[in-house]
A protein has these predicted regions:
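Short edge-strand/loop segments of extracellular domains
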Residues: 101, 140-147, 208-211
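Histidine-centered catalytic micro-motifs
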Residues: 108-116, 190-193
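Double-stranded beta-helix
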Residues: 133-190
Length: 211
């Protein structure tokens, strides 16, 4: 579901109906390049390994002005305030997913939900172009009720077998989009980062929690 970013009401309505919204051209290509150059200055020691084998700087907003700007984005904050009680922008995680032919790597460690709260917003910024092969964000629309019926294992993960059995393929949205695309998603819905097959994916992700 792709929207123009200028209508808060439309964004909220689609978020509530489908669980996600894709906002194109939220940042310019130049702004993304600046953010990417900033991100690449971070020392290795500020990164940790994610569950899917990706690299994550948990509080990149403390180091990078572009990340801090994304954390304090007023439009996204207004959406968060109206969407759920999880409206405190806690941190921006700078994420890097690198292809390695010897490893199976993704962001998130397979299908999962972030919590079992009634609703919880997360915002993503693609800093580079994301295609079918370099680990796009994947999301199961309208899956909130379904999630409650599925067995979960370590850290609210849901097996691929259960997804294959219970999820209609047309409800799985693979978010291929250029740099500058902003994605708002309810992380209590089923989602994952696709396993990377080539290249590198760079993103910012803002995590929202209850106050």
């Amino acid at each position: 579901m792709v929207l123009e970013m200028n209508t808060k009401e439309n964004v909220l309505n689609h978020l509530k109906e489908y669980g996600f919204v894709v906002i194109p051209n939220y940042w310019s290509p130049e702004k993304c390049k600046q953010a990417l150059n900033e991100l690449k200055t971070l020392p290795n020691q500020v990164f940790e390994g994610g569950q899917g084998g990706d690299l994550r700087c948990q509080h990149s907003n403390k180091y990078l002005s572009s990340s801090n700007e994304f954390l304090n984005d007023s439009f996204i904050q207004n959406i968060a305030d109206d969407y759920s009680l999880c409206n405190i922008a806690d941190r921006v995680v700078a994420g890097i997913v690198n292809y390695n032919s010897d490893l199976q790597t993704d962001s998130g460690g397979g299908w999962h939900v972030d919590s079992e709260l009634p609703a919880q917003l997360k915002s993503f910024m693609y800093l580079t172009d994301v295609n079918e092969e370099n680990g796009p964000f994947m999301f199961v629309q309208k899956s909130r009720d379904l999630v409650n019926e599925l067995q979960k294992h370590s850290n609210l993960r849901i097996s691929q077998e259960l997804v294959n059995e219970h999820v209609n393929s047309e409800d799985i949205i693979e978010m291929v989009a250029p740099a500058g695309t902003c994605i708002l998603a309810d992380s209590t819905y089923l989602h994952r980062g696709k396993q990377i097959e080539s290249g590198t994916r760079y993103t910012y992700t803002t995590y929202f929690y209850e106050g």
